[in-house]
Amino acid sequence: MEKNHISFENFEIEKNKMIPNSTNLIFYKNAFSKTKFMSKIMESFEIPIVYFDFDLLLSGYFESDSITKPSNIQIIKPDRENLKDLLSNTLTTISLQKTILILDSLNGFYSFVDDDKPGRFVNSVIMLLSANLKFSKSIMFVTCQAQKKEKRWTLPTGRHILEFENINRFEINENDTKIKIQNV
């Protein structure tokens, strides 16, 4: 994947909106485009990165050496048993140290919750993480495979994504050798 040159349209302009204390939803249609975009995000920051890899796609690329793993990244591969402890430790980390926190992906996160209403837990966790990252001026990214239906972002399962205020929303689309980033 790294060997193919990809250009990013609007990356620097949109990256300037990804400021400290911000939560950024990254909507995508293609998981490979998402991985390329998140690699670009990771290489553009020098501060520590905590990466929750719920879908294990990025971990697979690192393990196969298709993508070079940055030295400032901690990959977390949660499971149902360790998720709550990992979230607790992450809350402490992002409260004390400026960090890039990446939740990849919202779709995978939902699948970890054994509950009639997983949205309540997932949304509460995102709000709690978002509130705590402000102590250290951290930045959070949440990737999400979704599409806009009837003016609302919707997961492939039909579940609506809760719209929070003060969250940046970006959509990435790839064609040929270019990934376009657009604030939506």
Task: Describe the predicted segments one by one.
Residues M1-N21:
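Pre-Walker A adenine-sensing motif
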Residues E46, T68-P70, L96, F135, ...:
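Short, well-ordered coil/turn elements that cap or connect secondary structure elements
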Residues L57-L58, N107-F109, K148:
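Short, catalytically relevant binding-site loops at active-site mouths
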Residues E63, V113-D115, T154:
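Short amphipathic alpha-helical segments
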Residues P78-S136:
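Phosphate-binding/switch loop-helix module in NTP-utilizing enzymes
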Residues F135-V184:
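Phosphate-binding/switch region of NTP-binding enzymes
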